[in-house]
Amino acid sequence: SGLFGRYHGDYHFENILMTNRNKNFLLLDWRQDFEGSISIGDIYYDLAKLLHGMIVSHPQVNLNRYKIKNLSGKTYINIFIPENLKKCRIYFYKWLKKNNLSQYKVDILTSLIFLNIAALHHTPYNKFLFNLGKIMLQNSIENKEFYF
């Protein structure tokens, strides 16, 4: 079950700006609707999109700082995650817990986002995203921690 409320739809760091003058946040590139509604959507989806950006940073992808290898029938993946995003994810999980939000739901949706967007990207990045989504989904279902 979702948590419905005002939502963004493409909530990741590249779509969040902070003004210098009064430190307000501006959100860019709002999704036009969620299943036909322009006023409400699933907040868990926005939280999952934010977590997606903490794990896979577009600047790191643009610098080719991710890897995928197949050895003896097993797939291994890795991506460089800047220290600030690692800390951000720790605070994010604490914030979820403090606000009685489900980390499990956020992790499941994040893994589904990776699986869903994989087909939209070039090789080998698409294979990296697919395997990341698959590994994260399996770990989430089995209640295992997911580390990078």
Put a short name on every predicted segment.
Residues 24, 33-94, 111-125:
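Active-site activation/catalytic loop segments of kinase-like enzymes and analogous catalytic loops
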Residues 1-41:
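Active-site acidic catalytic loop and adjacent metal/ATP-binding pocket
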Residues 22-25, 101-148:
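Regulatory N- and C-terminal appendages and interdomain linkers associated
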Residues 2, 80-83, 106:
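Short, surface-exposed alpha-helical recognition segments that flank or form part
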Residues 54, 58, 92-100, 137-144:
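Hydrophobic, Leu/Ile/Phe/Ala-enriched alpha-helical segments that form helix-helix packing faces
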Residues 16-17, 60, 146:
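Intrinsically disordered or highly flexible coil/loop and linker segments, enriched in small
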